[in-house]
From Swiss-Prot:
One of its GO terms (biological process) is L-leucine biosynthetic process. NAD(+) binds at residues 77-90, 290-302. The record marks Y142, K193 as: Important for catalysis. The lineage of its organism: Bacteria, Pseudomonadati, Pseudomonadota, Alphaproteobacteria, Hyphomicrobiales. It is an enzyme of class 1 (oxidoreductase). The gene is leuB. Pathway: Amino-acid biosynthesis; L-leucine biosynthesis; L-leucine from 3-methyl-2-oxobutanoate: step 3/4. This is 3-isopropylmalate dehydrogenase. It catalyses: (2R,3S)-3-isopropylmalate + NAD(+) = 4-methyl-2-oxopentanoate + CO2 + NADH. It comes from Brucella suis biovar 1 (strain 1330). SUPFAM superfamilies: Isocitrate/Isopropylmalate dehydrogenase-like. It comes from the Bacteria.
Length: 370
């Protein structure tokens, strides 16, 4: 059996509660489906700072590099607001992304049928929505140099950020986009601002060339990023995979997430380069929601995003597509049954806590796996 090593990093706030529900699913995958997952655990974020004075220890970083995939909960909270900037809880996630060389961020936007009414858009606009935004994660304006504020000496200051992309950075993220599209509806929409940005001109040129060279079987269209934002709200179901840079991906993925009306229920994945020998990519999976310290420890957190992150892990790190499909179907089925945590509850549904929601999803998953 192939190695299936998972590192669990529950983190802070509601992270440990949500991760506890994922552990139940992994236990079933091993006991009943004999999939042989090996799990280790570590500390990240504020709890790691409390234990080690770092947002993630070197030892846990080594575990992450040795694992086939990392499942990450959430980090941060007011308890650590005054810690030094370089060891703030969020620095743990940034180090994971940097040391694991995770350059491709996958943000799905899925509308569960039972929650179509929760969107601010008309149900017919978002019913059946299933799009994937692929954001380049390690380049662009967030990392480009120079990045500084200059005192001009005349009472004025100048803020400088630099948008930089090299050909190889665009090629590798484009390859991921086309590969993902082949497993979906075979369409990529590349978004940039080539009309006003030289980096956008290069992005367009490189994606076009890469498509012609290696991925001509996939449909490709180009769209200016501002027009893309408008089209996401106008008719989002026209899209399959949206490929874009770090800045526009940051903006567009949050727009797409809110189309569903359930930002706190969505998973994400960050992938690195494929190993030349095994073809495996380093990968980290995490819910889009934060640590929600205001409800931590109360047993009311919604574990769906964390469980959906495990489904993404099964799909993209281990090729267990059927199992991922069933787990996602189990989530949808529980919502169809009217079971809700407090954050998505409405009159006429059944309000449950974290554990009850996790148990309901697991029961549905078991039934679908029988």
């Amino acid at each position: 059996m192939a190695s299936r090593k998972l590192l669990l990093l529950p983190g802070d706030g509601i992270g440990p509660e949500a991760m506890a529900e994922v552990r139940k699913v992994i236990a079933f995958l091993n006991s009943d489906l004999n999939l042989g997952f090996e799990t280790e655990e570590g500390l990240v974020g504020g709890c790691a700072y409390d234990a080690h004075g770092q947002a993630i220890s070197d030892a846990d970083m080594e575990k992450a590099l040795a694992a086939d995939a990392v499942l990450f909960g959430a980090v941060g909270g007011p308890k650590w607001d005054s810690v030094p900037y370089e060891v703030r809880p969020e620095a743990g996630l940034l180090r994971l992304r940097k040391d694991m060389q995770l350059y491709a961020n996958l943000r799905p936007a899925i509308c569960y049928p039972a929650l179509a009414h929760s969107s601010s858009l008309k149900p017919e606009v978002i019913e059946g929505l299933d799009i994937l935004i692929l954001r380049e994660l390690t380049g662009g304006v967030y990392f480009g140099e120079p990045k500084e504020i200059i005192d001009l000496g005349n009472g004025q200051k100048r803020g400088i950020d630099t948008q930089v992309y090299d050909t190889y950075e665009i090629e590798r993220i484009a390859d991921v986009a086309f590969e993902l599209a082949r497993t979906r509806r075979n369409k990529v929409t590349s978004m940039e601002k080539r009309n006003v940005m030289k980096s956008g001109v290069l992005w367009n040129q490189v994606v076009t060339a890469r498509h012609k060279e290696k991925h001509a079987d996939v449909q490709l269209e180009h769209m200016l990023a501002d027009a893309g934002g408008m089209q996401l709200v106008r008719w989002p179901k026209q899209f399959d995979v949206i490929l874009t840079d770090n800045l526009f991906g940051d903006l567009l993925s949050d727009v797409a997430a809110m189309l569903t009306g359930s930002l706190g229920m969505l998973p994400s994945a960050s992938l690195g380069a494929a190993d030349s020998k095994t073809g495996k990519r380093k990968a980290l999976y995490e819910p889009v929601h934060g640590s929600a310290p205001d409800i931590a420890g109360k047993g009311i957190a919604n574990p769906i995003a964390m469980i959906a992150s495990l489904a993404m892990c099964l799909r993209y790190s281990f090729g267990l597509v059927a199992e991922a499909d069933r787990l996602e179907a189990a989530i949808a089925g529980v919502l169809d049954d009217g079971i809700r945590t407090a954050d998505i509850w409405s009159e006429g549904n059944t309000k449950v806590g974290t554990t009850e929601m996790g148990d309901a999803i697991l029961a549905k998953f078991k039934a679908l796996s029988a």
